[in-house]
């Protein structure tokens, strides 16, 4: 099976944290696009972050550059996380003016997506959540989110609205935290073009088995719209190189992506703070490509082992011969 590979363009740029504002120089989006096209193996697309890479005023120019490099816009990620106006929530803010601003901004990014022939708008609603107990009306704020996402999906029926979940950061508790609550959020809109993005690292932090999450999205009505790949140690969203921690986990993921018929993008989403970005992201691409090959070559064997429910015993057999 030949999968579609992409990267988040901004991962080639500056990285920072709350202790250090800049670990690297930050190339322009145009330069990062050039670097991606010239250096990244296997990719056929890039993801663009709103305000970082793409806006209404540069959409036509960015589309021209993408076409020139033979790349697609795999998804657009609206920036509802880096604007201080959204620090206490975007479409879930208790301030109706902030909610209107956020929804209008999301509408503008959907328009941009259409301009660059992008079919996925990836919503990582990072500021929509809470930090302290007894400070949030969970029911009302979730309903505001549902209303906004429903409006967006209804107004742009040709786009897939993919909800990316993450347990925490920058808020201590996120409303889209894990597969189960995010699938519920998608279903509550009543719109078939609302689904889920799985970020492998977010799943690890949330204690999920990502392969099972893939199946849950399938069972919910083919709601898996997009995939982000990275790795971590299970306690924080470290955004490390794929397979620096997990291995069998990725083989199982790739198996279930194939078995469930997923045909979307496999996108690398890393934060190489101190590593060479081109090298780190390329390594992740090579790892995922290798796992794709393993699954292609051993698909029937893996399926048989799962069916027997004795995979650990059978995997160990070759070492005894």
Each model region followed by its residue ranges:
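Active-site-proximal loop/turn and secondary-structure-junction residues that shape catalytic pockets
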Residues: 11-13, 50-52, 79-82, 125-129, ...
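Gly/Pro-rich active-site loop or hairpin
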Residues: 13-27, 93, 136, 172-183, ...
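Generic structural signal for well-ordered alpha-helices
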Residues: 30-37, 59-63, 106-110, 145-153, ...
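Structural motif
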Residues: 39-41, 116, 156, 260
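A contiguous, mid-protein "functional segment" used to position or interact
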Residues: 260-310
């Amino acid at each position: 099976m030949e999968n579609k590979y992409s990267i988040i363009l901004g991962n080639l740029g500056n990285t920072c944290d709350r202790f250090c504002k800049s670990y690297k120089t930050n190339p322009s989006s145009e330069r990062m696009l050039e670097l991606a096209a010239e250096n990244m193996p296997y990719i056929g697309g890039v993801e663009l972050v709103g305000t970082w890479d793409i806006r209404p005023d540069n959409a036509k120019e960015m589309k021209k550059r993408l076409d020139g490099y033979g790349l697609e816009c795999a998804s657009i990620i609206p920036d509802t996380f880096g604007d201080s106006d959204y620090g206490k929530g975007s479409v879930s803010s208790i301030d109706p003016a902030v909610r209107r601003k956020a929804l209008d901004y999301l509408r503008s990014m959907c328009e941009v997506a259409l301009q660059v022939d992008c079919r996925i708008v990836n919503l990582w609603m990072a500021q929509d959540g809470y930090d302290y107990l007894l400070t949030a009306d969970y029911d009302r704020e979730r309903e505001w989110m549902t209303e906004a996402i429903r409006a967006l999906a209804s107004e742009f029926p040709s786009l897939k609205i993919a909800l990316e979940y993450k347990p925490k950061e920058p808020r201590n508790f996120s409303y889209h935290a894990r597969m189960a609550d995010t699938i519920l959020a998608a279903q509550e809109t009543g719109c078939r073009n609302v689904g889920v993005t799985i970020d492998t690292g977010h799943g690890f932090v949330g204690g999920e088995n990502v392969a099972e999450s893939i199946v849950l999205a399938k069972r919910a009505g083919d709601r898996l719209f997009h995939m982000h790949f990275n790795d971590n140690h299970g306690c924080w969203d470290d955004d490390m190189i794929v397979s620096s921690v997990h291995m069998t986990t990725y083989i199982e993921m790739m198996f279930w992506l194939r078995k469930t018929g997923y045909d979307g993008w496999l996108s690398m989403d890393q934060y190489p703070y101190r590593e060479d970005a081109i090298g780190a992201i390329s390594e992740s691409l090579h790892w995922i490509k290798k796992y794709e090959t393993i699954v292609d070559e051993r698909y029937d064997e893996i399926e048989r082992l799962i069916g027997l429910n004795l995979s650990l015993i059978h995997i160990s057999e070759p070492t005894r011969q």
